[in-house]
Amino acid sequence: MQLTLNKSDRHSSNRAGGGAKMMTLIGALVGFIAGILIYLIQEYWIADFDDAYFEIAALFFVATFAFSALMLARHNQIIKPVIGALVIAGALFVLDYNLISFGSARDNDINTFPLFFWVMLSRSLVLFLALTLMRASLDGSFPPRYVDVFENGVSIPIITAGAKLIALLTLLLLFAWARLLKEFDVLFFHELFQEQWFLFPFLGAIAGLSISLMHGQTAVISAIRFLLKLLSRITIFVSALFTITLAMVLITKGTSALFEADVERPAVILIGLAMTGMLIFNGVYQDGQDKPPPLWLRIPTLITLIGFPVYSSLAFMALFARIDDYGLTPIRITGLVIAGMAALYSIVCLAGLLSELRWRAQRWMVPVGPLNTVMAGIWILALAGLASPLINLWSISAQSQFARIASEKVDAEDFDYGYVRFELGKYGEEQLRKMKELDSHPQIDIIRDEVDEVLSAPSYWEYKFPLTDDSEFEAADEPVSDL
C-alpha cells in the first residue's frame, strides 16, 4: 500500500513538473509572438505616429493581451484564460483609442491630463483589478470569493515585479556578453541586438519566460507576502498616530487650518493619505479568514478605520472649494471621482467598525471581505468611465466654465478665456462663442472683446502677452547690452 502511494505521489509530481515546463515554454512562445506583432505594427503599419491612433491602441492591445493571457494561464485550462485575456485587452483597447485620439500630443489646444493619468496610473490599476477578479474567478467560483481575490491581488504585483527583475537581469547579462564579444572584434551579436526585428521578439520572449518562471516560485511569493504583512502591521501604528494628530488639529484649530496652510493641492495629499490607510488596513486584514488580532494590533487598526472617512470628507471639502471658485476642469473632475471612491470606501470601514460590536467573534470583520470585492468592481467601472467616450471631461469642463460667466459668478475681466480656448479644445471654442450671445450680461462688451481676442490668438502665451507691432519683435531680437 505504501509503495502504491509513493508511486502515485511521484506520478503527480512528474505531471506537475511537466505542466510547469510546458507553461514556461508557452510563456516564452506567447512573448515571442507578441514581440513579432509589435515589431510589425510599428514598422509597417504606423506611417505617421501623430495620427496613428488606432495603430498605437493596437500596440497596447497586443501587449495587454499577451500579459493578461500569461497572468491568467493555468496548466489545466486554455480556453478560459484566453477568453478572459481577450475581454480585458479588448475593453482597454476601446478606452486607449478614445483617449489617444482625444489627447494627442500634436493637439496643442486640449488638456492632456486625462491621457497622462490614464497611461501613467489609471490603466495599470484597471488592468490589475480586472486580472485579480478574473484570476480569482478561474481559481474558484463566480462571483469570486474574497479569499481568492486577496490571494491573487497580492500575487499579481509580486509576479510582475519578479518577472521584471528576472527580465532586466537577463538582458543586462546578454548585453554585457555582447559588449564583451565586441571587444574581441566579434561584432555579430552586438549588431544583432541593435536590430529591431530581432530585439522586439527577443524582449517579448524574455518577458514571457520571466512571467512563467515567476508563476512557479510559490515559496518566494509566500515569503514576500509575509514581509508585506509584517510591514503593514508596523505601519498601521504610524497611520493611527497620524489620524490622532489630525484629529487634534481639527479639534483645536478647525478645518480652516488645513486649507489655509501653505500647501499646494491639499485634496491630493488627503486622498493620498486615505488610499495609503486603505492599503495598510487591508494588509493587516489579509484574506478575512483569521481570528481577531491581539489588542495591540486591533486598536490602531480601528483608529485608522475611523480616520478614513475624515480624510475623504476633507478631500471633498478642498475640491469643492476649488470648484466653487474656479469651476470644473479635467483634473478636478478626476479628483472628484477618486475622492468619491474614497468616500464610498467609508462604507466598508463603517461595516468593519460595526462588526466590532461582536468583539469576541470567531472571524474578524466578516463584512469587509465581500465589500472589498464589490469595491474592486466599482473601481474598474469608475476609472474606465473616466477614460470612456461616455464621460467627456473636456466638454463637461467647458460647460462649467460657461456657467461661471453666464451666472455672473466671476468678473468678466478676471475670467481665464485662454484656458477655455487652449485647454478644452473644440468644446471650449463652442462655449466661448456661446458667451458672445449672452446679450443680457452686464459685461457683454468685455466678454465679446476677450472672446474675439482669444479666438484669434495662435497660442495661450501670445494671448496672455500680445505683441502689438513688429517693433516689439525687433526689440526682442536685439541683444541686451552688457552695460
Regions from the language model: what does each represent?
Residues Q2-S312, A321-A387:
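Hydrophobic/aromatic interaction determinants used to assemble and anchor large protein complexes
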Residues S124-L127, G140-V147, L171, I221, ...:
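Low-complexity, intrinsically disordered regions enriched in charged/polar residues
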Residues L381-A412:
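Hydrophobic alpha-helical transmembrane segments in integral membrane proteins
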Residues D414-L483:
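Extracytosolic and intramembrane catalytic regions of membrane-associated proteins
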